[in-house]
């Protein structure tokens, strides 16, 4: 299979994630779309790494996954805090978290 197909898949996944971030109001769905965008970037990094024949893209994808794991912890903690105070997971309620 040609590496270009992986780049096309990466572009489609990134676009779906970006559309989800822009159009959805539920914080959990937005969070999942951001993770989809990160995974699409990882797929592109690994594909470019394979095309060039070096491991730099794979190492960078590993570090992106480490940062994404930390993001999951912080993001879910914020979503739970919003849900506990407002009984809603809407991103519109995020500005009300300080009260």
UniProtKB/Swiss-Prot annotation:
It is an enzyme of class 7 (translocase). It is found in: Cell membrane. It catalyses: a quinone + NADH + 5 H(+)(in) = a quinol + NAD(+) + 4 H(+)(out). The chain crosses the membrane at residues 3-23, 28-48, 62-82. The keyword ATP-binding does not apply. Keywords: Cell membrane, Membrane, NAD, Quinone, Translocase, Transmembrane, Transmembrane helix, Transport. It is a multi-pass membrane protein. InterPro entries: NADH_UbQ_OxRdtase_chain4L/K, NUOK/Mnh_C1-like. The keyword NADP does not apply. Its EC number is 7.1.1.-. PANTHER family: NADH DEHYDROGENASE SUBUNIT 4L-RELATED, NADH-UBIQUINONE OXIDOREDUCTASE SUBUNIT ND4L. Belongs to the complex I subunit 4L family. This is NADH-quinone oxidoreductase subunit K. It comes from Acidothermus cellulolyticus (strain ATCC 43068 / DSM 8971 / 11B).
């Amino acid at each position: 299979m040609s590496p270009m197909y992986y780049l096309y898949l990466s572009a489609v996944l990134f676009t779906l994630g970006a559309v989800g971030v822009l159009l959805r109001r539920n914080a959990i769905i937005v969070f999942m779309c951001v993770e989809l965008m990160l995974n699409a970037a990882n797929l592109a990094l690994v594909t470019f790494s394979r095309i060039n024949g070096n491991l730099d893209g794979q190492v960078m994808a590993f570090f992106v996954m480490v940062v994404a794991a930390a993001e999951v912890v912080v993001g879910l903690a914020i979503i739970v805090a919003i849900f506990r105070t407002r009984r809603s997971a809407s991103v519109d309620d995020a500005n009300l978290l300080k009260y």
